[in-house]
Amino acid sequence: PIRIKGKQLTKNEVEVDGTISSQFLSTLLMIGPVLENGLRITIKGNLVSKPYAEMTVALMKHFGISVSWKENTIEVAHQKYIPQPYKVEPDWSAAAFWYSVVALSKDAEITLSDLQKNSLQGDSVVPELMKQFGVETEFLKDGIIIRHSAFNIKHSTLNIDFIDFPDLAQSLTVLAAALDLKIQFTGIEN
């Protein structure tokens, strides 16, 4: 067994290497308001997966937290979260697997509930990316319908930069292999 004994943090400034992962930043953002002196975060390097950090800030604002983000500096003062209802939106990266099923089928049609076009998730680029794999998306009021299109993708060489949505790399890598496509993936270092 492991025993971890915490202590009260005394400093309110921290530097985060933005080139590794946005998860460290999101964690610090969420604890910032409960720290006695708040938190000032300086991001070193280019922030990968920035949409995930932006989603964290939007969620914090929903619960009453004021966040100041200017260039590579984020400040969160000591504040209280205000509990209130929140509907968690479905996961676009999970939807990518269903898009892959449709891309590999000739006449598949799948309805996915509650996915929204104007999502905060960086992975919400799935509909645009999957056009290249022969999948079209119809946005409905309460979700989406995805269908195989007649687009012939066998003659395409694709270049995809995953820097803002690295969680999609796994499903698209397998799909590209299954379709025997030539694709160059970048931005998956983290």
What annotation goes with each model-predicted range?
Residues 1-190:
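Short, structured segments at the rim of ligand-binding sites
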